[in-house]
């Protein structure tokens, strides 16, 4: 796949890029994040390969490299949490219990930018009940850490989160940092309260009828503390309404959330095809380094795979690949049935060498512009 060509764009030296590309190629072959599996897929002695991978992980700041994949043309940034189970890791320090209170594992919060219906990762943090003391307070701090990690990159862009993030402490942090946000409201067993006034004397009940157009509440107090805008819709076919909390204009917040809802988050392919949930590291430091490398590998493979999908299933000319806009296809087209990464890993050999070279050349141009901007 000529990963080295892409690696040279984001790594500081050609020598480092060469090492990284060998490891990333092996990750795709192994379809595994485990160093032993990766070393086995590399040419040469497996034991020597294993040590080389370990040295590489120790020496490189892969989180910094991952941030270079931030798409500056993105309108918004997505926060996407997932649970990674580690049922056998009883003595691993960073592993705690997941939301069911029993299963061993940890949380991974990934920040990503949208790219034609896909999520391109650019930052993440890991945390668990074992790495924090007070669950509510520390969860807030970990979520803040994720945002703080790329705050300079985010700039004026809006951050979009799901309902796990609609709690007061996190919203207050975003407000202090003057970050624009759109967050789905958690309407669980204990929904948050809203008030017309900061003294909490006049409570407001969110109400909307099925099929009713957007219901908007402007400048109301969330938990009686923070001024926010709230917008709700209840569309036919849904059991309950969708409520959005935002510091944007309500209509704009709803528009952005609807765009986000059409985007495939990255964890389905990361777990299903690259088996990221099988990651095994005793050290949290090495865990985060290998996860960063997996995300970098995924991002490059995603771009190439999406181009292959367009060429093979939508009959796009290889030199006319456009990863910013999806091709025009019938709803019955198989283009809608497969992800680009699936085609790259499972069906790449069906392309002739010339076509594959043209695809990679086109994708490299897109990748270069993604990293450095269009006008470099």
Regions picked out by a protein language model, each given a short descriptive name:
Residues 1-34, 41, 57-60, 70-73, ...:
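Single, function-defining residue in the core of a domain
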Residues 47-116:
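Active-site-proximal, Lys/Arg-enriched surface segment
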């Amino acid at each position: 796949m000529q990963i080295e060509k892409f690696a040279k764009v984001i790594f500081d030296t050609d020598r480092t890029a060469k090492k990284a590309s060998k490891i990333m190629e092996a990750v795709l072959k192994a379809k595994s994040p485990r160093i032993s599996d990766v070393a086995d897929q590399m040419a040469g002695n497996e034991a020597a390969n294993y040590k080389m991978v370990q040295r590489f992980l120790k020496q490189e700041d892969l989180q910094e490299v991952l941030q270079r994949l931030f798409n500056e043309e993105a309108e918004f940034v997505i926060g996407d949490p997932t649970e990674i189970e580690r049922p056998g890791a009883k003595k691993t320090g960073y592993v705690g219990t997941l939301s069911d209170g029993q299963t061993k594992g940890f949380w991974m919060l990934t920040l990503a930018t949208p790219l034609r219906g896909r999520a391109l990762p650019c930052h993440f943090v890991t945390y668990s009940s074992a790495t924090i003391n007070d669950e509510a307070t520390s969860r807030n701090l970990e979520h803040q850490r994720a945002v703080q990690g790329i705050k300079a990159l985010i700039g004026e862009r809006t951050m979009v989160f799901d309902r796990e993030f609609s709690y007061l402490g996190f919203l207050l942090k975003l407000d202090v940092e003057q970050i624009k946000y759109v967050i789905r409201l958690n309407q669980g067993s204990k929904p948050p309260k809203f008030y017309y006034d900061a003294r909490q004397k006049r409570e407001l009940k969110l109400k909307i009828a099925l099929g009713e157009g957007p219901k908007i509440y402007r400048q109301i107090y969330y938990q009686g503390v923070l001024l926010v805008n709230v917008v709700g819709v209840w569309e036919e076919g849904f059991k309950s309404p969708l409520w959005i909390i935002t510091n944007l204009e309500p209509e704009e917040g709803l528009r952005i959330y609807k765009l986000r809802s059409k985007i495939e988050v990255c964890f389905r392919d990361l777990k299903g095809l690259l088996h990221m949930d099988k990651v095994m590291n005793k050290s949290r430091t090495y865990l985060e380094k290998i996860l960063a490398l997996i995300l970098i590998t995924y991002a490059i493979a995603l771009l190439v795979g999406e181009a292959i999908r367009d060429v093979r299933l939508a009959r796009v000319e290889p030199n006319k690949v456009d990863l910013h806009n999806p091709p025009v296809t019938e709803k019955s087209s198989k283009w809608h049935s497969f992800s680009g990464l699936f085609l790259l890993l499972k069906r790449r050999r069906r392309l002739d060498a010339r076509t594959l070279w043209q695809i990679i050349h086109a994708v490299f141009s897109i990748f270069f512009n993604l990293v450095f901007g269009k006008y470099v």
